[in-house]
Swiss-Prot record:
PROSITE patterns: RECOMBINASES_2 (PS00398), RECOMBINASES_3 (PS51736)
Function recorded in the entry: Cooperates with the mucAB genes in the DNA repair process. Could be a resolvase-invertase protein.
Gene name tied to this protein: uvp1
GO terms under biological process: DNA integration; DNA repair
DNA-binding region, residues: 168-187
Name the UniProt record assigns to this protein: Protein uvp1
Active site: S9 (o-(5'-phospho-dna)-serine intermediate)
DNA repair in keyword set: yes
Keywords: DNA damage, DNA integration, DNA invertase, DNA recombination, DNA repair, DNA-binding, Plasmid
Similarity comment text for this entry: Belongs to the site-specific recombinase resolvase family.
Gene3D superfamilies in the cross-refs: Homeodomain-like (1.10.10.60), Resolvase, N-terminal catalytic domain (3.40.50.1390)
């Protein structure tokens, strides 16, 4: 039996294209699901339809996906899954990545697999970053690092630097920041002070 699995991991994705390609590949049954960010674990609560799909597969069956990254999870989970399929006598096909473990030269296929693993992990990281930034923007956060000094810290720093005996290095050490950070806060806007750089 040829079984397909389609997955979308963001609200911007649609499984229609994946399902169409799986149907063209001869899939008799297709499992598909939406994976929410944060559900990166393949089994248990992360991808129940993938789990159902894997349970349905029998020796001699074929699992078809549009692309390797549709299996989700981490790179190590994908490698483990592919190894498990091989041990169970199940053929694996990833249409977009041109992977077909039924091909006669298995060694070449695994070499090809290893070549695309790095691209797979890079794409997963990009997707996670974009999803995280979109979620942060939705909560009103625009990203970037939190300021290293509060308004109270800046005021105290300016008072300390007004003392001619106080050095930038000493103030930086007191606030656990770099000297460059001290310069940045003392030269912002129209405010510029002569400070002791010793």
């Amino acid at each position: 039996m040829i079984i397909g699995y389609a997955r979308k991991s963001t609200h911007l994705q649609d499984v229609t294209h994946q399902v169409d390609e799986l149907t063209k590949a001869g899939c008799e049954q297709i499992y598909h699901e939406q994976i929410s960010r944060g559900g990166s674990k393949r089994a248990k609560n992360g991808a129940p339809e993938l789990e159902n799909c894997l349970k349905a597969l029998r020796e001699g069956d074929t699992l078809v996906v549009w692309a390797l990254d549709r299996l989700g999870g981490s790179l190590s989970q994908v490698i483990t899954l592919l190894d498990d399929l091989k041990k169970r006598g199940i053929t694996f096909i990833a249409i977009k990545d041109r992977i077909d473990t039924s091909a006669p030269v298995i060694g070449e296929i695994y070499t090809h697999l290893m070549a695309i693993f790095s691209n797979f992990e890079r794409n997963r990281n990009i997707e996670r970053t974009r999803s995280g930034l979109a979620a942060a923007r939705a909560r009103g956060r625009v990203g970037g690092r939190k300021p290293s000094l509060s308004e109270d810290d800046i005021n105290e720093m300016k008072i300390l630097l007004a003392d001619p005996e106080m050095t930038v290095g000493a103030v930086a050490k007191r606030f656990n920041v770099s000297r460059m950070t001290i310069y940045r806060y003392t030269t912002k806007g129209n405010h510029s002070e002569k400070i002791n750089d010793e």
